[in-house]
């Protein structure tokens, strides 16, 4: 069964509301990521935890950025605390960081664009600053409703892709640690369907 099969087009349209909202950054970046994944043998990326890091990744020639949950937990969460990789930080921290990184990338692109128009920069030395960001959604910070809301926040922030772990959110541990508690397969499928619905709406 395909994840999309849970909701009919009519149900999605009904939930969408009368105002069609376009998230151009997310759409552009997800299409770019899809092209990369289908044309490159691999897509090398590094973890980034600030807007400046994202700009430096672009200048270094990377084609995508990874936003790791452990980095958000350790150093880049909205609580300003240092946490272990156990999803203890505020759930909106990673989407806020995606937005910050995209704002920095957009600004770097604007500066470069002005410099090229003004003749201060050779167009052949152009840097592609608009790198797709792949975000770690941890274990979703709860059940399907939480995954739905978190996915909406990532889309609004312009994430190109999000992945979710199949761990029980309330017992989440760092991926390389023992003693992890996994959710039943049916629960994980519900989480993925909720994320897909958020993207469709």
Name every feature range the model reports, one short phrase each:
Residues 1-3:
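Short, small-residue-biased leader/transition segments that mark boundaries at the very start
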Residues 27-38, 98-127, 192, 196-200:
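Surface-exposed amphipathic alpha-helices with a cationic face
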Residues 38, 42-55, 59, 89-97, ...:
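Glycine-rich anion/phosphate-binding loops
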Residues 39-44, 62-63, 129-131, 159-160, ...:
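Short, well-ordered coil/turn segments that N-cap beta-strands
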Residues 44-48, 65-67, 131-137, 162-164:
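Hydrophobic faces of well-ordered beta-strands that scaffold small-molecule active sites
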Residues 48, 53-119:
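Active-site cofactor/substrate anionic-group-binding motifs, chiefly glycine-
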Residues 70-98, 144-145, 151-152, 167-190:
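Glycine-rich tight-turn/loop motif centered on a GG-T
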Residues 161, 181-201:
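Phosphate/pyrophosphate-binding betaalpha-module
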